[in-house]
Amino acid sequence: MRIDRLTSKLQLALSDSQSLAVGLDHPAIEPAHLMQALLEQQGGSIKPLLLQVGFDINSLRKELSAELDRLPKIQNPTGDVNMSQDLARLLNQADRLAQQKGDQFISSELVLLAAMDENSKLGKLLLGQGVSKKALENAINNLRGEGAVNDPNIEESRQALDKYTVDLTKRAEEGKLDPVIGRDDEIRRTIQVLQRRTKNNPVLIGEPGVGKTAIAEGLAQRIINGEVPDGLRGKRLLSLDMGALIAGAKYRGEFEERLKSLLNELSKQEGQIILFIDELHTMVGAGKGEGSMDAGNMLKPALARGELHCVGATTLNEYRQYIEKDAALERRFQKVLVDEPSEEDTIAILRGLKERYEVHHKVAITDGAIIAAAKLSHRYITDRQLPDKAIDLIDEAASRIRMEIDSKPEVLDRLERRLIQLKVEAQALKKEKDEAAIKRLEKLQEEIVRLEKEYADLEEIWTSEKAEVTGSAQIQQKIEQSRQELEAARRRGDLNRMAELQYGIIPDLERSLQMVDQHGKPENQLLRSKVTEEEIAEVVSKWTGIPVSKMLEGEREKLLRMETLLHNRVIGQEEAVVAVSNAVRRSRAGLSDPNRPSGSFMFLGPTGVGKTELCKALAEFLFDTEEAMVRIDMSEFMEKHSVARLIGAPPGYVGYEEGGYLTEAVRRKPYSVILLDEVEKAHSDVFNILLQVLEDGRLTDSHGRTVDFRNTVIVMTSNLGSAQIQELVGDREAQRAAVMDAVSTHFRPEFVNRIDEVVIFEPLARDQIAGITDIQLGRLRKRLAERELTMVLSPEALDKLIAVGYDPVYGARPLKRAIQRWIENPLAQLILSGGFEPGSSITGKVVDDEIVFG
C-alpha cells in the first residue's frame, strides 16, 4: 500500500505514531500507537467522532496506555521502527473500505472503522466501550456527506463550523453571555428581516460602542429561551471567527478553500444556522491576492440564493467606506440602524449588568454609581458612545476598589515603612555610647512600641474587613450560579427544581448577604467595599483631567477665597478678578450652562495692566502651573487662510494629518484656560469659527471630529479702546460706553453678543505699582535664594524704583525694565566679579540718585 494514498492528516498521525513507538522503545508501530496518535491529533476528526457516538475518551486513553505498556521493549533502539503486521493489515482493510466507497485517498475515519474488528486486540478494546460498529458507520456517513474523498487535505476542511465559528446559542445556554437589557426594537427588526424569504440578511449599523454585538447576543438568548417566531426556533447562531479563518493560510487558495468548506457545511445545514459576522467590512478584500477573489465576492452567490443566513455588524464609517462601494454586496443586506441609547436606557442596561460585574470584581456596586456613570460619561466623555463608556467607568471603578482590597491599605503601608526606618535608626544608635544617643534610643524604642501596637490594631481591623468583603463576594457568586441554574431549569421545564431555587435557595442566599452587609462596621473603615458616585467621579477625573470628583474641604475654602489668591499675583482690577472667580465657582458647583464654555471673557484695557497676567494666575490657581494654559497669539492669524491652523488643514492640503492647533490642544486637555491674546489683530474670518465655540461649546475640526469646549475658560485680550480708558479715568459709565462703542465698531454684533462678560481693566495707579514692585522683587529674591543670597532694599530705593517704573500709559511693563536696569544689571556684575559669597545678604540703598549695593 502506497503512503501517498493516505490523506495528509493520516500521514501526520502515522508519523506521530512512529515517534511514539521510538519514545517508548517498542520494536514496531502497532495499531494502538496509531489510535493514540489519532486521538491526540490537533484539529483531527477522530476525537469529535468518538465523542459523537458516545465513547468515554478518558477511559479509552487509559486502556490504550495500558495496552502500550504491555508491549515488549527493546534495549539500545536505533530509532528505525517499521509497521507491524497488525498495522499493515489494518491499513489494507481501510484501503478496501476506501475503494468500496469510491475514494481516491484513505481517510482517518476509515482506519477507525476498519479497527472495529472483533478479531483484533484494538477492535476488542474499542468494542468494549459499548458502541456498535453500525452506530460508528452512521456517524461517519453523516461526517462525510455524499461526496467521495478525492482530496488529500479534505480532513482539514471538515468541521469547518467548529473550527472557524463560535456557537453563541451554546454560550447563551451555558450562561456565559451578559444579559441584554432593552434593545427590543432593534432585536425585533433583526428577527423581522431574518424571517424574509429572500435577502433575509440584516446588517447592524451604528457607532462603535452602542451595542451591535450585544444585539446578536440578545438574539441568541431569545432563541434559547424560545422567545422567537416558529421560523427561528431551534436554530443556532454562530459567530464567524475571521482570525481563525485567515490564520495559517500560507498558500494561495488555502483561505478560499477554508471559506468554501465553511459555506458548503452551512448549505448542508439547510437554514438551521444563522451566521453572525462581526466587523462585516473585514470580509471585503479579505484574502484578496493578485487576480483572486475576496471573501465578499465569495459570499454574494450564497447570500443571493438564501443558502447563507447571515447577520452582519459594522460601524457607519466602515459601512460607507467598504460595503456601500460594492453595490452588489450592499443590496444583499438589509440595514438595521442601532442608535446610541439615552441616559435612562443606559441606566437600565447598567442595572442589568450590575450583578455580573459585582461577581467578577467581588465588590458591591451602588445604584448611585450606576446613575453617576451614565450621567458623567454622557457629559464629560464626548468622543465615545453610551452604553460602552458608562460600562467602562463601572468596570474600572470596581477594578480600582478590588485592587485596594487585595493590596495593603495606604495607612498600614506608611506605618510599616516608618517602623522599618525607626528600627534601622535604633540599630545604628545601639553602637553609640554617649548620653545623647542613649536618650534618643530610649525615645525611639518607645515610639517603635507605640507604632507596633497601632499597626497591629489596624492590621486586625483590615483582616476582619477583608474577610467580610470576601464572604459577601462568595455569597453573591452562589446567587449568580443559582440564577443561571434557575434559567436552565425553566428551559427544561423542571418545575420542582425551579420552585426549590426560586422559593428556597435564592431567598436564603439573599438573606445571608443582607445579614453580612448589615454586620459590616461603619467606623474604622480601612477598605472601601462599594463602588459609589465618588469612585465613578474619580475615574472620570483620571480619564479627562476634569475635576468632577467631590470637592475636599480644602478645595472649597480655596474656591471661596479665590479673589484673594488671584490678587497675590494681580494687583487691582477688582471687576476682572471677581468675574473670573464667579465663572470658576459656577463651573465647580455644577451650575454653569452644560452646553457652553465655563466662562468666556473679553479683557479690554491699556497695555501692561495685567490682562495676560490674570490668565496666567487663573491657570496657576486651577492647575498649580501657569503652563497649563493654551495660549494662542492672534497676531499670527492676520491672513484669511490662517484660520486653517486653528482647526486643521482641509483634506488634500499639506498638514491635514496633523490636526488643528486649537482643536488638538483642547482634545488632549478638555479642562483648560484658553487665552486668545491680542484678539483684535486677527483676521475677521477667524471670529466666525469662534461663534459656535462661544455659543454651543463645540467645534468641528478638519477630520470631522467634534471637540468639546464646555469645560474650558476662554479669555480674549485686546487693546481696543485703551485711549478712551486713559482719557476717561474715574468715570466708569462713560469709560464703558466709549470702549463698547470701539468694540462694536471692530467686532460683529453676533460675536460680541456671545461673550459672557466684557471686562474693562483700569489704568494702574501709583500705589498699585508699589504692590507689583513687591511681586517682581519677590521673584528676583527667589532666583537669588537659589544662589544662597538674600536681598534687602531700603524704603528710598523702593520709592526710586516706583518713581522710575510708573507710567500711566504703559502700565507695569516700564517697572520690569526699571528693575532690570537699576537692580539686576548691577547685581549681575557684582556676583560675577565675586563680590558676594554664598550666604551673603545684599543691601540696596540710594546714594547720589543711584541705587548702590553693598
Swiss-Prot record:
Region annotated C-terminal, chain positions? 764-854
Identify the CDD domains for this entry. Answer: AAA, RecA-like_ClpB_Hsp104-like
Please provide, in alphabetical order, the Gene Ontology terms of the cellular component aspect for this entry. cytoplasm
SMART domains in the cross-refs: AAA, ClpB_D2-small
Domain of life of the organism encoding this protein: Bacteria
Q: Where does ATP 2 bind?
A: 605-612
Q: Where is this region: Repeat 1?
A: 6-71
Q: Which UniProt keywords apply?
A: ATP-binding, Chaperone, Coiled coil, Cytoplasm, Nucleotide-binding, Repeat, Stress response
Q: Which Pfam families match?
A: AAA, AAA_2, AAA_lid_9, Clp_N, ClpB_D2-small
Ranges where the record places region Linker: 341-545
Localization of this protein: Cytoplasm
Q: Which InterPro entries match?
A: AAA+_ATPase, ATPase_AAA_core, Chaperonin_ClpB, Clp_ATPase_C, Clp_N_dom_sf, Clp_R_dom, ClpA/B, ClpA/B_CS1
Q: Which GO terms describe its biological process?
A: cellular response to heat; protein refolding
Q: Where does ATP 1 bind?
A: 206-213
Its primary localisation, in coarse terms, equals cytoplasm
- In residue numbers, the region (Repeat 2) covers 83-146
Question: Domains: what does the record tell us?
Answer: The Clp repeat (R) domain probably functions as a substrate-discriminating domain, recruiting aggregated proteins to the ClpB hexamer and/or stabilizing bound proteins. The NBD2 domain is responsible for oligomerization, whereas the NBD1 domain stabilizes the hexamer probably in an ATP-dependent manner. The movement of the coiled-coil domain is essential for ClpB ability to rescue proteins from an aggregated state, probably by pulling apart large aggregated proteins, which are bound between the coiled-coils motifs of adjacent ClpB subunits in the functional hexamer.
The family note in this entry says:
Belongs to the ClpA/ClpB family.
Checking NCBIfam families in the record gives: chaperone_ClpB, PRK10865.1
Q: How does it assemble?
A: Homohexamer. The oligomerization is ATP-dependent.
Protein's job? Part of a stress-induced multi-chaperone system, it is involved in the recovery of the cell from heat-induced damage, in cooperation with DnaK, DnaJ and GrpE. Acts before DnaK, in the processing of protein aggregates. Protein binding stimulates the ATPase activity; ATP hydrolysis unfolds the denatured protein aggregates, which probably helps expose new hydrophobic binding sites on the surface of ClpB-bound aggregates, contributing to the solubilization and refolding of denatured protein aggregates by DnaK.
Q: Which PANTHER family match?
A: ATP-DEPENDENT CLP PROTEASE, HEAT SHOCK PROTEIN 104
Q: What protein does this entry describe?
A: Chaperone protein ClpB
